[in-house]
């Protein structure tokens, strides 16, 4: 008999895997800008597929950590338990609610995933700067990304419960991922000298995907709004909806449009 935790992990991966495209997109954008910069500098031969795959793997693990952490802390707040309209797009993965994984196993999944991200990030930093803890944009985007991943719904920060979750999503899937990928992949140009890094172009390129991923999260908050409001998860939809016997969502829907 297959242990339920393994079945739960498989279910979680299967249901969440399509959403990894939200990570692939910003990494691909950062890589595309990096490739163009290398080509213009006549250094396209320095392109490293190994570094690209490491960046993509580290970013993907960060999203897995964010999703698992969200499942765990939305369970502890009771938000997912009282959600009456869960779907593949909202209400969490449901592996805790249907008993396929314990809350502890989900938390361990989050911690192991973020540990993998940190390990990859430190390795990339060492490859670019010569030191695991070299003071580079890789280190700082890694620190910010880790904070956003675990602090999205995690105690004691709980950005998503305080109305900052949407901003955290935009930052994490926009500038953090795009600019982090770009810095790693253009190391042969800037040679770890910040003034040589074409960060403005990478930042501009990150804005559209930051907004798009944030809107994906926002539109799926409408279904969660009643349960989120009940546990004090003050998303933008909850904050802008009119309260009463029935929650009226016309105002946040107009804002979304």
What does each model-identified segment do?
Residues 91-191:
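Intramembrane alpha-helical segments
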Residues 18-22, 50-54, 105-109, 137-141, ...:
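Alpha-helical transmembrane segments of integral membrane proteins
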Residues 41-69, 137-146, 150, 195-219:
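Membrane-embedded alpha-helical segments that form the functional core of polytopic membrane enzymes
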Residues 29, 33, 37, 65-69, ...:
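Alpha-helical membrane-inserting segments
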Residues 1-8, 13:
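Single conserved hydrophobic/aromatic residue that forms the stacking wall/gate
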Residues 168-225:
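Functional transmembrane core segments of multi-pass inner-membrane proteins
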Residues 24-30, 167-182, 237-245:
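Small-residue-rich segments of transmembrane alpha-helices in multi-pass membrane proteins
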Residues 69-114, 210-256:
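Solvent-exposed interhelical
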């Amino acid at each position: 008999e297959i242990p339920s935790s393994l079945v739960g992990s498989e279910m979680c991966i299967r249901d969440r895997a399509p959403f990894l495209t939200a990570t692939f997109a910003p990494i691909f954008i950062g890589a595309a800008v990096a490739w163009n910069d290398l080509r213009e500098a006549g250094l396209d031969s320095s392109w490293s597929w190994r570094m690209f795959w490491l960046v993509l793997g580290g970013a993907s693990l960060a999203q897995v950590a964010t999703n698992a952490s969200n499942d765990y802390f939305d369970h502890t707040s009771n938000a997912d338990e009282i959600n009456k309209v869960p779907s593949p797009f909202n209400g969490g993965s449901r592996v805790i609610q249907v008993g396929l994984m314990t809350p502890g196993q989900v938390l361990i999944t989050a911690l192991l995933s973020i540990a993998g991200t940190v390990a990859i990030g430190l390795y990339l930093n060492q490859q670019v700067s010569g030191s695991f803890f070299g003071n580079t944009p890789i280190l700082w985007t890694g620190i910010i990304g880790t904070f956003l991943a675990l602090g999205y719904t995690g105690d004691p920060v709980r950005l998503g419960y305080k109305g900052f979750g949407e901003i955290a999503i935009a930052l994490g899937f926009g500038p953090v991922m795009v600019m982090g990928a770009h810095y790693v992949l253009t190391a042969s140009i800037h040679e770890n000298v910040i003034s040589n890094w074409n960060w403005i172009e990478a930042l501009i390129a990150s804005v559209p995907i930051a907004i798009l991923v944030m809107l994906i999260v926002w539109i799926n908050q409408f279904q969660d709004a009643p349960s989120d409001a009940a546990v004090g998860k003050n998303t933008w939809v909850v904050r802008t909806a009119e309260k009463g016997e029935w929650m009226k969502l016309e105002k946040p829907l107009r804002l979304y449009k």
